[in-house]
Each structure stands twice: as C-alpha cells, then as structure tokens.
Amino acid sequence: MREIVHIQAGQCGNQIGTKFWEVISDEHGIDPAGGYVGDSALQLERINVYYNESSSQKYVPRAALVDLEPGTMDSVRSGPFGQLFRPDNFIFGQTGAGNNWAKGHYTEGAELVDSVLDVVRKECEHCDCLQGFQLTHSLGGGTGSGMGTLLISKIREEYPDRIMNTFSVMPSPKVSDTVVEPYNATLSVHQLVENTDETYCIDNEALYDICFRTLKLTTPTYGDLNHLVSATMSGVTTSLRFPGQLNADLRKLAVNMVPFPRLHFFMPGFAPLTARGSQQYRALTVPELTQQMFDAKNMMAACDPRHGRYLTVAAVFRGPMSMKEVDEQMLAIQNKNSSYFVEWIPNNVKVAVCDIPPRGLKMSATFIGNSTAIQELFKRISEQFSAMFRRKAFLHWFTGEGMDEMEFTEAESNMNDLVSEYQQYQDATADEGEEAFEDDEEEVNE
C-alpha cells in the first residue's frame, strides 16, 4: 500500500499531531493499546497508509515525535493514546529552542536532526511503496518552525521524489505566544515555498474566530482549537485512508491542486461547524454543507476568499449521500460565484465522497482551496516582520546563533515575491492566464 510517514515537531506540532492520531485511530477502530476493535472491513482496507502492523496484530502509527524539550513528550506519553506510539520514535532534546528559529534550525535542532532522520529512515524501510511525508508543526515557535523546516530540507535531499505535505499553524496577532513570531514565520515560509509540495495553512486567528463566533465559546482553549484542526486533518486525509476514487494519494492531490510549483499553500475549511453540545440537534443536507463549506467564516486560515480567486478547489464529503446531489450542488456554487474562480483553469473543482462519516456526525464536508486570498496571511506576517526588522529589534537572538542579517532580507523578499505571484494570477484574465500557463509548461518540458 501507499504509505505515509508522519512527523510531528515542537509543542504545537505534537499537540495537533497527537489529536490527529486519536481521531483517526477512533475512525479506524484502533484502541489506545493498538488493538483492532472496529466493525467494518473498510476500516482496515487501507490501514497501512498510516499504521504498521506488528507481529502481535497491533497497529502502530508510522510516526516520529520530535521536540527540543521533554515536556510535551511526557504529556503525549501520559495522554489517552500515549501507549500507541513506538517508544523508540520519541526523539527529544533537553534544552528547548526558546521560540528561536535559529536554535531550531542551526544549533540545538541540528544536533538532534540525525537521530530523527534515523527513525524516519527506519520507518521508510518498513514501507512497501512510500508515497510521502506529512509534518505537523507551527511556524511561530522555535522547534516546529526551525527544526521542522530543517527536517523537511534533509528529507527532501534523501527522498527527492516523494511528496512532502505539511500542516502548518501560522501565527496571528490575536493569539500571540511570542514577540518574535513574525521572524520565525517568515524564515519558515522561505523554506516551505522551496521544499514542500502541499502546505495546509492553519491559522490561530481563524480558529479563534470560529470558536468564538460559530461555536459560541467565550474563552476558547488550545484544546478547542486543536479539536478543529484535528477534524480538518481527518477530513483532508479521508481519501488517503479509506477506499475512494479521487485524490486517493498525496501526488494525485498535488497534481489537481498546484497549478504553479510555488503556489501550494492551501486554505482548509470544515462543515458542519456546530458547538460540541448541539451536534445531534441539526439535520444536515448536502446543500447546507456545500453552502457552509464555502463560507468565509468556515475557513481555517484568516483570509477572506472573497478578496481573491480560487485557482483550484478539492472537497471531501463524508457520510451516506447521493453523489449526484453533491455534484449538482458543487456546480451550482461554481455557477453562482463564477467570478471567484479563475476562468483560465477549467474544471478546477474536484470532489471526493467517502461513505464513512466522522465520529458523532451524520455527514461532513472538508474543503481544500488554493485561493489567491491566502496572500493576506503572508502580507500580515510580512508587515509585522518589516516593522521589527527595520529597527533590527530582537535580531541579536538570531545572529547570536550564527545567523546573518542577509538571511532575513532574503526570506523577506521571497515572501513578498510569493504575495505578488498570488496577486498576478488573481488579476490574470483568460488570455493572460493561458499564456502564463503555457510559459510554465514550456519550462517543465525543457
């Protein structure tokens, strides 16, 4: 089977990663000890994508858990699914990265990276046919951002033809942990643009707004935010984990979603978003799901898709529903909002349907959009970056670890280039767009 190796780095990465494993273990009928307690053959049909089967019929996540301090690992280990993971696959330092990208990327992280790569290598050797890697991390801290991007580039060197997929939590002013977040994020995006094939941008600000406005939680905790992230991650990986037709592996998804190699930052969304207590009181219909799924309020990145245009969209519907109805609703949305889809990529909306709904819901829909509006997120980080960098504020923490100011300047201009590339395709009309598309193809053919 087409296996995926999962890596989670840093505090945020480990928290959302562990939640992801809890959710998908539940969906596949795997109990906290790794035993199978499910009731459907579908649960096991593609179980090998994320789990190794041990000789004693135990299912073990194909996961490496990485952090530069022991704290998060301890809480994962003592959590409900702590015994599910292979003990050898916990790799941690003692010092911590102190929210410093340079420590994660160049000093502390660089010392630990080889032992992580050993674990990754071992997991890859157990694979029949490895399709790629997925990393969960945040871009605001030190370990997930600095060491996470270091791991990506090392894995890229060793497995250049495998897909690299990340779930990256972007910093936001509303939920700020550290003052140097804009530095860490800009340096990370600089790496992600070059080294990943698909990046799901998850944004704390958007998650907060969803908890606050839609779920009516007055004081959302990180637990509530992670609950949303895990629902979304479970949704976007559905077609990888259950037998289905469309986007059934990472490469097919990338082919459908990425028209230009640098523009691979996706905006995820999820429906239905109902407060945790009131799920059973809602009867859901396909039109409602479709409507909600495209709603700006349901996006997990704090960008308004109405301020941009969709290059491509993939949607995953889950639950017993009529394929025909789903297709009709999706067409209706495209026709009604045609100005929000670029006209120079025909058929740019793809739909997959999986019969198995997530736990506690009759049906759900997950949205993956490659929208030019994602530039708002990068602009926001860039403005904060420039404000501090102009004054060289806090730079000594980074230069002290051996970094050069030049690197900051490069990262900044790379991110600004990314913003203008998104803008260019947002403004492109059919005639210009097609030319751009052809130019791009010519380069590929050479």
UniProtKB/Swiss-Prot annotation:
Gene that specifies this protein: TUBB6
Species assigned in the record: Bos taurus
Name under which the protein is recorded: Tubulin beta-6 chain
GO BP terms: microtubule cytoskeleton organization; mitotic cell cycle
Subunit structure, as described in the record: Dimer of alpha and beta chains. A typical microtubule is a hollow water-filled tube with an outer diameter of 25 nm and an inner diameter of 15 nM. Alpha-beta heterodimers associate head-to-tail to form protofilaments running lengthwise along the microtubule wall with the beta-tubulin subunit facing the microtubule plus end conferring a structural polarity. Microtubules usually have 13 protofilaments but different protofilament numbers can be found in some organisms and specialized cells.
Localization in the cell: Cytoplasm, Cytoskeleton
Domain notes: The highly acidic C-terminal region may bind cations such as calcium. The MREI motif is common among all beta-tubulin isoforms and may be critical for tubulin autoregulation.
Keywords: Cytoplasm, Cytoskeleton, GTP-binding, Isopeptide bond, Magnesium, Metal-binding, Microtubule, Nucleotide-binding, Phosphoprotein
Top-level taxon of the source organism: Eukaryota
